[in-house]
Amino acid sequence: VGFKAGVKDYKLTYYTPEYETKDTDILAAFRVTPQPGVPAEEAGAAVAAESSTGTWTTVWTDGLTSLDRYKGRCYHIEPVAGEEDQFIAYVAYPLDLFEEGSVTNMFTSIVGNVFGFKALRALRLEDLRIPPSYIKTFQGPPHGIQVERDKLNKYGRPLLGCTIKPKLGLSAKNYGRAVYECLRGGLDFTKDDENVNSQPFMRWRDRFLFCAEAIYKAQAETGEIKGHYLNATAGTCEEMIKRAVFARELGVPIVMHDYLTGGFTANTSLAHYCRDNGLLLHIHRAMHAVIDRQKNHGMHFRVLAKALRLSGGDHIHAGTVVGKLEGEREITLGFVDLLRDDFVEKDRSRGIYFTQDWVSTPGVLPVASGGIHVWHMPALTEIFGDDSVLQFGGGTLGHPWGNAPGAVANRVALEACVRARNEGRDLAREGNEIIREASKWSLELAAACEVWKEIKFNWQAVDTI
């Protein structure tokens, strides 16, 4: 067929409702809001075209390749209930479009220029189905849930953490003191805040040294393995790895990375280093709400969570359902399952558009953090289960008697909830009573209960089905 210059509708090439998806295809579900007058089929086809092989006009070099082999295809369109001007477009991408083991390349195609396309008023990537054949090109999490439990020798309960506050301004020695007090009081982990890197008031090397001293002192006194998430995030990949190397030399168990601001290339490099050198990797999702908060534009966090499991991380922040940050229960539990489980069935009631098989990729521990305190402990234990990290920053350091009593209060509350659950009690219904009973024999918990008895964050979640 000879080359014919000009512009033709995307749907003539890229809308293929008869297409049967392959096991090796990457499947995407986009929420599309087209400009007025743009038909659904044309808008869906435009998304498929602009995120794969297409451009705005026909080009003669199309004849030098097999478009049928490489093009993305919009294979199904369905309306969004309650939204007249929105629909879900399902797009299938052949695996050959993507570099092996590169989240960066996958996202550059699927959520690249197409999000600025003029024919669309808004576009949101709701979910991805990543085929096993592509998953197997990634290392994934450095260690995973079971290996972490074995390293820490901690089983049968959620892990407890605390973000050191104030997040900025402390000297390294005072910072290390707070770490020691929290770990000595009964927490498993303490944490650098996401924006603690290497600032004039506290350079990274000083912080690492004082935190390592705190860890070893707390371990010696409690007989438990302890950790502090040392944030290795830096301005360059080379500097990031240098910090991780120093953490390994200190013998600490875990480092941390801000994976969205740091970038997927840097994160994958750090995850590989962590597996090779026995370090756990905690992931913070700073900047996620810029990408996932709007309901009709951007990318849902479940996609960012899947991308993290590919790129690599042993923990990731995943909302709390009950605290100060965004997170509706069923949707949150949907992507928590996508982080932890080996096989997750399609379930639209939880926002899961595709069945996902992780083919034994290690799981990631979800971290509940943000505005939570001892009264939330029963709900958090019931919602997240044992394979989670519950992190209380202000809920530890805000205790009226200090940091160590704050840690004691949280540990007592957690142990009480786990014991009550194991005895068959209903945490959702009897939670407050369980905490009150425990506070009778723990003065630290009683004081915490009194301070935070009136604190609630009663705003509606934006992210709903």
Curated annotation (Swiss-Prot):
PROSITE patterns assigned to the protein according to its UniProt record, in alphabetical order: RUBISCO_LARGE (PS00157)
Q: Could you tell me which residues carry N6-carboxylysine?
A: 191
**Which positions does the record annotate as the modified residue N6,N6,N6-trimethyllysine?**
4
Residue(s) at site: Transition state stabilizer: 324
Q: What InterPro entries does the record point to?
A: RuBisCO (IPR033966), RuBisCo_large_chain_AS (IPR020878), RuBisCO_lsu_C (IPR000685), RuBisCO_lsu_C_sf (IPR036376), RuBisCO_lsu_fd_N (IPR017443), RuBisCO_lsu_N_sf (IPR036422), RuBisCO_lsuI (IPR020888)
Transmembrane stretches in the record are: none
**Which residues does Mg(2+) bind?**
191, 193-194
One of this protein's GO BP terms? reductive pentose-phosphate cycle
| Textual note on the cofactor | Binds 1 Mg(2+) ion per subunit.
Residues of the active site: 165, 284
Cofactors, names only: Mg(2+)
Q: Where is this gene product found?
A: Plastid, Chloroplast
The cellular component terms of Gene Ontology attached to this UniProt record, alphabetical and capped at eight, are: chloroplast
- PTM: The disulfide bond which can form in the large chain dimeric partners within the hexadecamer appears to be associated with oxidative stress and protein turnover.
The record's misc note reads: The basic functional RuBisCO is composed of a large chain homodimer in a 'head-to-tail' conformation. In form I RuBisCO this homodimer is arranged in a barrel-like tetramer with the small subunits forming a tetrameric 'cap' on each end of the 'barrel'.
Question: What role does this protein play?
Answer: RuBisCO catalyzes two reactions: the carboxylation of D-ribulose 1,5-bisphosphate, the primary event in carbon dioxide fixation, as well as the oxidative fragmentation of the pentose substrate in the photorespiration process. Both reactions occur simultaneously and in competition at the same active site.
Subunit arrangement? Answer: Heterohexadecamer of 8 large chains and 8 small chains; disulfide-linked. The disulfide link is formed within the large subunit homodimers.
The record's HAMAP family line, in alphabetical order, gives:
RuBisCO_L_type1
Q: Family per UniProt?
A: Belongs to the RuBisCO large chain family. Type I subfamily.
The entry's protein name is Ribulose bisphosphate carboxylase large chain
The organism named in the record is Securidaca diversifolia
User: Source taxonomy lineage?
Assistant: Eukaryota, Viridiplantae, Streptophyta, Embryophyta, Tracheophyta
